Amino acid sequence: PFHIGHLASTVIGHSLKMIHAFSGYNCVGINHLGDWGTQFGKQILAYKLWGDKETVERGGVDELVRLYVKFHAEAENDDSLNTRAREEFTKLEHGDEENTALWRWFVKISLDECNRTYDKLGITFDSYAGESFYTDKMPEQVEKLKESGLLKVDNGASIVDLSEYNMPPCLILKSDGSTLYPTRDIAAAVYRDRTYHFDKCIYVTASQQCLHFAQWFKVVELMGYDFYDKLVHVPYGMVSIDGAKLATRTGNVILIRDLIDAAVEKVAAVIDEKNPDLENREQVAQDVGVGAIVFHYLLNSRIKDTNFIMDDALSFDGSTGPYAQYTYARTCSLIEKAGDIKNANVTITEPSEAALMKTLSRFEEVVDAALRDYEPSTITRYIIDVCVSFNRFYQDCKILGAENDDVRASRVSLVKATNTVLANALPLICMKTPKKI
């Protein structure tokens, strides 16, 4: 299921795609689906033991999760279930008709659920080629490893020895011949190089996978592929709920759809109270509710561990998405009320005007820093700086009621500049820009 543990890779990845595109790169967003592996052996066995078609069709991904959690609970006391699950996955790898049909069904149910959430987040992908896409592309890479003399057999498993590089061996094939993550990742990287001829191939995953990426990046280099130095791993910190680690197998998750629904409901209540006649109320509630979640996620450095507390995510006080979107909407309102204003030289009469100009002038360097460091939070924190500077200017200075036309035109120009910066900056962190809230 799409839970908040998946939100980090989704929004960090999409933000980095937007930042690179804004900086002139031609970007391809890939959703590397985890649609292959021993977890499907567990899912298939759980379904065969405790599931039925009608219940899964009715319950969808929730029923699949229930079965998956039940498998792990039962396996705690019966290790033979793990052996049987591995056997089911081996059958799947060898093209077993029944298991292949079940696998396709489970993947479709999961992807349909994910796509509904992606739609709400406003995030799209150019490719959904997941792990299963590379099953027929792995033998070529395994053969290349054998021919190069890199592949060794250790206790029945096929490995690449990386002790020379102070790393554990990289496992390529299990003793039963089934593949592992590195096998699939190497095949995927080769395919992407041949298909896209990339300048960078960026992987956004949890920091627990740093060793995994270091290992197979090194294997790619040892295989002689010249794109090895274009592979970039962008790690992020662990996500927990009130200090408890997220895990689908235990059922300790908060589904993104539930979080979005709660946020949108809260925003809708605020709109009903403060601006009940607002046009497109439902869409604005959606944009601001989703924005509150995304902004909360991207406010801190990606490498920091996140203890996700629901009330904090949905708070509308302080450095939040709603505050940023409301500030943008305020600039839109002022520009609309100002009407046609002649171009004006900016006349500085108040310290807050100078401070706002200085903050706005940093936009280009902030984007460059975010690009260099693969760090969306650089943009997020800058947006807060802009909003704070603008609202201080708004409090200190009469804009539409300025003392003369030149000062009025000058201040409206500052409003327009703020509007332009926010209109460009907010989408870089997956945020919508409603003109009225």
List each model region and its residues.
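Non-catalytic interaction-recognition regions
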Residues: 1-437
